[in-house]
Amino acid sequence: MKLFVLILNRTEKLYDLMAAYAHAAICGATIIDSTGMARELYGAKHDEEEISFFGSIRKYLTDDMRKTSKTVLTVIREDQLDTIVRITEEIVGDFSQPDVGIMFSLPIDFARGKGLNK
């Protein structure tokens, strides 16, 4: 089994994404509101000299920019990884583009809960 993690910046795609996951028998996701590091630093108004990389990212940040992301966590079987990645890219878009999101998976050594013993 794997833990599939999606940090979704295009939050308007969340409903369609969850519906597509359910249609593909990928169920049981947990969705958490999240904020990226750059947004948090920008909102905190830190001294730019204090954080060396801040000056380089400042030009990409504006007050009307997306303030939150959604972090989606779901436990999947190994054979579902290609499916969930394909669905996510089809609905959300090209992850090599800025402000789309990040997705990755981690191996799970142990899991117990409803639906995890399949």
What is the role of each PLM region?
Residues 1-118:
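Positively charged, small/polar-rich N-terminal and surface patches that mediate targeting and assembly
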